[in-house]
Regions:
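Conserved Radical SAM active-site core
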Residues: 1-3, 17, 35-115, 121-125
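Short glycine-rich, flexible loops that bind phosphorylated cofactors or substrates
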Residues: 77, 141-142
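P-loop/Walker A phosphate-binding loop and immediately adjacent motor/lid segment at beta-alpha junctions
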Residues: 84-92, 100, 143-167
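Well-ordered beta-strand positions
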Residues: 130-132
Length: 167
């Protein structure tokens, strides 16, 4: 897996001061996407064990960091899920900080359904480590810059614990 960039101190992609990991690769290609350069799966740098350690160590060494946000590109693209499922679990275990994730897929039909277009053997493990999921494709016709943490009205902020899903 590759990543486009890492921001170590951001406030725009979730509550508090967060680390944002922008992964590479997306086949959804939403019209008006703010990160179209990250559609290419080989864009940016390779996500290595050293990269993981640097992110985790930064979170552990800086108490003001609220957590990690994973966005893209598309974190739930089947090609990214194995690496990210393992990483977010490790991040959660080692830091006990929150994890937010943005996806253009819809939770119920694309991720949870066994025949969902982004469902893989890693999806449930990935979802189990996430505290907040922002789902739904960016829709330029529903764009609304006044919405907190979302770009369009069709996107949802889902607090995973509150959903009581049996994942």
């Amino acid at each position: 897996m590759h990543y486009a960039k890492i921001k170590y101190r951001t406030i725009e992609n979730g509550e508090g001061i967060r680390i944002s990991l922008f992964v590479s690769g997306c086949n959804l290609r939403c019209k008006g996407c703010h990160n179209a350069q990250a559609w290419d799966f080989s864009y940016g740098n390779e996500f290595t064990e050293e990269t993981e350690k640097k992110i985790i160590d930064f979170a552990k060494d800086n108490s003001y960091i609220s957590g990690l946000t994973v966005l893209g590109g598309e974190p739930f693209d089947p090609r990214n899920q194995e690496t990210l499922a393992r990483f977010v679990k490790r991040f959660k275990e080692e830091t006990n900080k929150s994890i937010w994730c943005y996806t253009g897929y819809v939770l119920e039909k694309d991720l949870l359904a066994d025949n969902g277009r982004a469902h893989t053997q890693y999806t449930k493990d990935f979802l189990n480590s996430i505290d907040v999921l922002i789902d739904g494709p960016f829709d330029i016709d529903q764009r609304d810059l006044t919405l907190p943490f979302r770009g369009s009205r069709n996107q949802r902020i889902l607090k995973m614990k509150d959903l009581n899903l049996k994942i």
